[in-house]
């Protein structure tokens, strides 16, 4: 697969916390954990969303926090270089079907569902071929300190350089990587 293209950041700037756009689709407990850790680690463009009917409440809750609340996953997907689907395993298929086609060319997409087969199927079915897939799963709950906890990384459809970038971005969790 050829990565990059119109709208994609050059490889040298994609991993720069000042310019890299990170997206979190799903602001439940795990989405919030990831968003806050990324922001606190200095990633300056963390775009988040939840279900459209929660937009106004989410916007009020996170106003002035350094997170950018967007109306829906289309907007998060279109502008983010690294996107994490933080949704329940039972909803991954419908959420990726809805927002996956909007994914920015050359972006890296991850999912953190606990059941990977439906996630992989949804990604392969609905994501454009010109995006990368490096999935993840934190082996702890949202109220457990992630430091030293296992974080599974799955290099599904991505070259090594994209895997290294995901490792760099997720380093803020201070988790122990487990590769599958």
Task: Describe each model-derived feature in a short phrase.
Residues 15-19, 78, 104, 146:
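Short, flexible coil/linker segments at domain boundaries that flank nucleotide/cofactor-interacting
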Residues 23-24, 85, 153:
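Hydrophobic Val/Ile/Leu positions in short beta-strands of Rossmann-like dinucleotide-binding domains
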Residues 66, 80, 106, 148-149, ...:
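Short, well-ordered alpha-helix to beta-strand connector turns
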Residues 45, 68, 108, 132, ...:
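Conserved beta-strand segments of alpha/beta enzyme cores
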Residues 74-126:
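Rossmann-fold NAD(P) dinucleotide-binding segment
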Residues 41, 78, 129:
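Structured loop/turn residues at beta-strand edges in well-structured enzyme cores
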Residues 116-180:
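Rossmann-fold dinucleotide-binding core
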Residues 2-75:
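NAD(P)+-binding Rossmann beta1-loop-alpha1 motif at the extreme N-terminus of oxidoreductases
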